UniProtKB/Swiss-Prot annotation:
GO MF: ATP binding; phosphoribosylaminoimidazolesuccinocarboxamide synthase activity
Source organism superkingdom: Bacteria
Keywords assigned: ATP-binding, Ligase, Nucleotide-binding, Purine biosynthesis
Protein name: Phosphoribosylaminoimidazole-succinocarboxamide synthase
EC nos: 6.3.2.6
Stored NCBIfam families: PRK13961.1, purC
Keyword Nucleotide-binding: yes
Cellular component, GO, one term: cytoplasm
Originating species: Xanthomonas campestris pv. campestris (strain B100)
BP term (GO), one: 'de novo' IMP biosynthetic process
The gene coding this protein: purC
Pathway: Purine metabolism; IMP biosynthesis via de novo pathway; 5-amino-1-(5-phospho-D-ribosyl)imidazole-4-carboxamide from 5-amino-1-(5-phospho-D-ribosyl)imidazole-4-carboxylate: step 1/2
Name of a matching Pfam family: SAICAR_synt
Family per similarity comment: Belongs to the SAICAR synthetase family.
Amino acid sequence: MPVSTTLLQSDLPGLPLRHRGKVRDVFDIPRDRLPADAPPGDYLLMVATDRLSAFDVVLPDPIPGKGEMLCQVSNFWFHKTEHLMPNHLVDIRVEQVLPEGVDPALYAKRAVVTRKLKPVPVEAIARGYLIGSGWKDYQRTGKISGIELPDGLRQAEKLPEPIFTPSTKAAVGDHDENIDFDAMVKTVGAELAERVRDATLRIYRFAADFAAERGILLADTKFEFGTDADGRLYIMDEMLTPDSSRYWPADQYELGTSPPSYDKQFVRDYLETLDWGKTAPGPRLPADVIERTRAKYAEALQRLAGISVD
């Protein structure tokens, strides 16, 4: 899968921009741009750009091909988990909805047409290992999101069972905050909270087993869900990508340390060496950090989905 032109920001005249996130640009698709046989309903065009964020700040330098690789990983998992949970993808090709004059090759592998859903206003996080903000919370309180954990656990230790730890859904530039399940219930209601929790853990267990067969540990992951007009629950946005998940090479896993991961760790490590306040604007990245990060995304895509990047 050759990587095409780098895309930092998508501009599609005739498609109203609904949201520009840290990585994805989301456009409403007017009815007259849809194929005549499209089922009734509202649809979105979701574009994965090559933007990179770290510490909740979008950095000025993109990672070439990152959006295509993220989209490929997401699509792989959406199709792989259809038996577990419906997803937001629909059977409408990207080139069918693009405005005239836009090169479809630029968007073919980095964009998808999706159902327009009502987002559940909580990030759904599954954790199988004690790392990241979960490790920090455990050190401080012995708990993660109100869940009591055994004493004496070490950094990166596998948890007795995967746990569901929701968080707030922050705006671009703000920080998500871990919340307990009771707080989620107050936000979305008990019935929906339980459906999201059950789906999150069910998908995590399936994906963790699949990744383990390929020599990769899925330490944790974050999902987003949405509902349609009839209250049906769908998984949406991105799925099990290196941006939303912490993947570790199993052969480099060592208890008590933070294992290397298939993500933007090279970027985070570099930024930690700078005198930077972790607020916008972010600093420029050296070419070697960009290339090493791109290679990590490409390796994750190849090992998980069997798709090679030239």
